[in-house]
Design a protein with these regions (language model features):
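Conserved ABC ATPase "signature" region
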Residues: 106-124
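Catalytic Walker B motif of ABC-type/P-loop ATPase nucleotide-binding domains
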Residues: 152-156
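Conserved ABC transporter NBD signature motif
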Residues: 51, 55-63, 72
Length: 209
């Protein structure tokens, strides 16, 4: 199977070098590295939020610098550590994020399926200002998933969750990604989650394993 994402000789800010990497559809890859190794910056390089000093990122065989940034960021979705939700209901947040990215919004059934995948146990009409930090994080992940990305970049997706909820969420997300051919790249400081769910790990301080 062809790689959906491939990096070559990437350098950021002329000082952070990254290993070459290939990721295939449906593959679950966890990234490792100490603080300061540039894990979050690596994700921003992969979806074109920032540009490398040197090297290339290929998405489906094309240099991402040749791809419309809005289109790229709908297909290579970055769910960062900060989960921002607009005022209003969960449903309204789905609609606003899709409007913001100039994307056709999902129907209610599709929204609910994404909420279920992210273990969100309440309705689309729930006001977001009543949610806890962990609940907001899961809604934010569900919205990101609703764009049906080809590549899902997950930066500490369970940071606001307790251990049991974190494991259940990762079980759902990894199953969803495998079943739908979504390549998932995950940064997590939780060693248990890495050992349990990673099909492969990449050390940003060295070579892939």
């Amino acid at each position: 199977m062809e790689a959906v994402l491939r990096t070559s000789s990437l350098v950021f800010l002329d000082r952070i070098s990254y290993p070459d990497m290939e990721v295939r559809p449906g593959e679950i890859v966890f990234l490792r590295g100490p603080s300061g190794s540039g894990k979050s910056s690596f994700f921003r390089l992969l979806n074109g939020t920032v540009s490398p000093s040197r090297g290339t990122v290929l998405y489906r065989g094309r240099d991402i610098l040749e791809i419309d940034p809005l289109l790229l960021r709908r297909e290579v979705i970055l769910a960062g550590q900060s989960a921002y939700l607009f005022p209003g209901t969960v449903r309204e947040n789905f609609l606003q994020y899709h409007q913001y990215r100039d994307s056709d919004p999902p129907d209610s059934e599709s929204m609910q399926a994404c909420l279920d995948a992210c273990r969100v146990p309440f309705s689309l009409d729930t006001p977001c200002d009543t949610l806890s930090g962990g609940e907001k994080q899961r809604v934010f992940l569900a919205i990101a998933l609703s764009f049906r990305p080809a590549v899902f970049l997950l930066d500490e997706p369970t940071s606001a969750l307790d251990g049991a909820t974190a494991e259940a969420l990762m079980a759902n997300l990894t199953e969803y990604c495998r079943n739908h051919g979504v390549a998932a790249l995950v940064v997590s400081h939780d060693r248990h989650l890495t050992e349990k769910f990673a099909e492969r790990t990449v050390d940003l301080g060295g070579a892939a394993s």
